[in-house]
Amino acid sequence: MRLRNKPWAEDYLRKHNTVVDLDGTHAGKMSEWFEKDQPIYIEVGSGMGQFITELAAQHPEVNFVSLERDKNVMIRVLDKVLEKDLQNIKLICNDAMELTDYFKDGEVDRVYLNFSDPWPKKRHAKRRLTYHSFLALYKAILKDEGEIHFKTDNRGLFAYSLESMSQFGMYFTKINLNLHDEDDEDNIETEYELKFADKGSRIYRMEAKFH
C-alpha cells in the first residue's frame, strides 16, 4: 500500500513510544518493549491497521507487533492505536527481511500475513511473503508450536503459498477456501477484506505450522 508522501511522518512517529524503532537501535530488546510478559503475535504488513488494532483491543492478554515499512502507512496504524488507547501493541517501521534483527529465536507465538502483495510475475516470486526465504525467517522467530495465519483474495497467491509452505516442510491445521461462506465469528476483517467481500470476492485463509 502506497500513500502520498508525508514529509512530517517520521517526526510524528518518533514522538510516540508506541513506535519502537525507525533505525534499528532497539533491535533484539523485546523484553523492554512491553510492560507485561505475554505471548507475542506479529502482523507483517499491517496496512491501515484495522485488523491488528481490533485484535489487540479484543485480546489484552497478548502483546502485538505491527511491522509496516511505509512511514506514510504506519501513521494510520498509530492513529488507530492512540484512538483505542491500546497498551499491548508496538509498531516497527521496517522491512520483513529484517525480522530476525528484532526478534530472538523462538520468541514469537504467531505471525499474521493478511492480503500481502501477490507479486504475480514469476520473476518477482522471491518478493512474496510466503517465498522460502521469508518462511525461513518466520521459522527462526516462531516457537516450536508457533503458527502462521494467512489470508488473501488472490487465488494464485493462495495456491502458491500452499505449495511453498508444503515444500518447506510445513503442515496445515486449517484451510478455508471461501472464508465468508463459513461464518467464522472470530474473523476480524481488514480494510482490503471489507472491500473485496463487498464486491463478492472469495477470501482464502489458512493456518500453518512448521514440523
From Swiss-Prot:
Entry annotation: catalytic residues: D117
Gene3D superfamilies attached here?
A: Vaccinia Virus protein VP39
Q: Kindly give the InterPro entries that the UniProt entry links to this protein.
A: SAM-dependent_MTases_sf, tRNA_(Gua-N-7)_MeTrfase_Trmb, tRNA_methyltr_TrmB_bact
Q: Which reaction does it catalyse?
A: guanosine(46) in tRNA + S-adenosyl-L-methionine = N(7)-methylguanosine(46) in tRNA + S-adenosyl-L-homocysteine
Pathway, per record: tRNA modification; N(7)-methylguanine-tRNA biosynthesis
The record ties this protein, via SUPFAM superfamilies, to: S-adenosyl-L-methionine-dependent methyltransferases (SSF53335)
Entry binding sites for S-adenosyl-L-methionine:
E43, E68, D95, D117
What Pfam family is a match, any one? Answer: Methyltransf_4
Q: Source organism's superkingdom?
A: Bacteria
Listed under GO cellular component are: tRNA methyltransferase complex
Q: Could you give a GO molecular-function term held by this entry?
A: tRNA (guanine(46)-N7)-methyltransferase activity
Amino-acid positions noted as binding substrate in the UniProt annotation, renumbered to this chain: K121, D153, T190, E191, Y192, E193
Q: Which Enzyme Commission numbers does its entry carry?
A: 2.1.1.33
**Keywords of this protein's UniProt record, alphabetized?**
Methyltransferase, S-adenosyl-L-methionine, Transferase, tRNA processing
Q: What protein family is recorded?
A: Belongs to the class I-like SAM-binding methyltransferase superfamily. TrmB family.
What this protein is reported to do is described as: Catalyzes the formation of N(7)-methylguanine at position 46 (m7G46) in tRNA.
Q: What is this protein called?
A: tRNA (guanine-N(7)-)-methyltransferase
What is this protein's gene name? trmB
